[in-house]
Swiss-Prot record:
This is Arginine--tRNA ligase. SUPFAM superfamilies: Anticodon-binding domain of a subclass of class I aminoacyl-tRNA synthetases (SSF47323), Arginyl-tRNA synthetase (ArgRS), N-terminal 'additional' domain (SSF55190), Nucleotidylyl transferase (SSF52374). GO terms for molecular function: arginine-tRNA ligase activity; ATP binding. Its EC number is 6.1.1.19. InterPro entries: aa-tRNA-synth_I_CS, Arg-tRNA-ligase, Arg-tRNA-synth_N, Arg-tRNA-synth_N_sf, ArgRS_core, DALR_anticod-bd, Rossmann-like_a/b/a_fold, tRNAsynth_Ia_anticodon-bd. It comes from Salmonella heidelberg (strain SL476).
Amino acid sequence: MNIQALLSEKVSQAMIAAGAPADCEPQVRQSAKVQFGDYQANGMMAVAKKLGMAPRQLAEQVLTHLDLSGIASKVEIAGPGFINIFLEPAFLAEQVQQALASDRLGVSQPTRQTIVVDYSAPNVAKEMHVGHLRSTIIGDAAVRTLEFLGHHVIRANHVGDWGTQFGMLIAWLEKQQQENAGDMALADLEGFYRDAKKHYDEDEAFAERARNYVVKLQSGDAYFREMWRKLVDITMTQNQITYDRLNVTLTRDDVMGESLYNPMLPGIVADLKAKGLAVESEGATVVFLDEFKNKEGDPMGVIIQKKDGGYLYTTTDIACAKYRYETLHADRVLYYIDSRQHQHLMQAWTIVRKAGYVPDSVPLEHHMFGMMLGKDGKPFKTRAGGTVKLADLLDEALERARRLVAEKNPDMPADELEKLANAVGIGAVKYADLSKNRTTDYIFDWDNMLAFEGNTAPYMQYAYTRVLSVFRKADIDEQALASAPVIISEDREAQLAARLLQFEETLTVVAREGTPHVMCAYLYDVAGLFSGFYEHCPILSAENDAVRNSRLKLAQLTAKTLKLGLDTLGIETVERM
């Protein structure tokens, strides 16, 4: 149930009846403060201006046409023309019942779309590092949310599996295999890449051989394709271990590497030339874009084919967008790529639109994100100043969580402790990132993310177990509880119920904006409201069975909402902590 959408429709109808244009925006929002009700309609100001009347006068006229019987207990005008809406307790009670009767907690399904989500995108023959964390987990939270809402989601892991470096890597792999050390060398991908690069820089004969190998690989030679495939397979096998540890839904089937688009590139360059979009300039093929200016104020030239015939990332990204629309039949494409790539993507997409490869009706959205910083405010590095490997980061998270869990549960069996430490440690790393607005940089701080206070994974996981503990203590007759009515008579019951019923609205925002921090803030709010409700509205010692059962049902919906909400973020819940 989307109460915001229901109220928007009702207020909109009343505004039109009061003389507003048919496309008027009621601007119904969740109220920021309890005294302003549960919802507030803020659209009178803009519409009144168009109608040449005072906003408060319009609000008064709207109220004469607004029928919220059975939904609102009170509707009032505030300030210059805001309409405050207070929900009817009986309406809240009925909606709580309906939410509990549904596996989806009453969340409706929007029109199903095919949505391609581009995220993670590690490079072949390199280990994943902290720079891959944000794209991987924010993208996966978006995927989980969109799938829960019923969309057909295609995960696209745009792996860096092509380029001139592969001649060097294949030459080095061949050398290692001749020395019977191929498998051992590939066990340490980072070292393998580093050694290959060192030889390439220092040994001219090796470098020449590597350059020849690139040509042979690009011409489709079977032996070189096989060597290339081996490098890709080993990298993706290692990456899959990381994805599984992170509780991320990516699999090998989701790999759509740069190499996938290679066959399309010559045709795209030829087509852009034929359409008069691309021209020859100093031996290269260039698209000049009026939308982007260089330092001199002239249209910026975007190279799509180099003088030597090589293609660029832009060419691949043009092909990629075209493929996602024409072959994958995307209705919407989301890219979880860091903010530094924004101009590059905008240029590629401008060319895509001009060439008619993807119509304007299909959004191409750059859901950019900021950087992960150390406590010093600089990019997160090892003490020695190197890049932090993702596997090392997760190892440390697990070790810190083990100590934390063992401290609180000294008698817990080892296997249970390990399972709990894993949920807490990995959850802490993910939640610390997901709870921040993705567009900003954020400080990575172990102490904050593993704290049991504040908007953290351990606090949210604990809040969930706290709700479950109510049911462990209660001697519950499941059948009697299922048929018991919900009674909302206390303010704290009403506040908790109203917030729980905003779950669908929260999911809708996350799906539209790609902002999982909105879900984190919502769940944290729910946990806080439950805490206040638990303290002031006795559950197990309620004055009678009817009130007890009603409050148990509110607790039940709280537990289900926390679990489902955390699941859309890819955060594991636990039964006890």
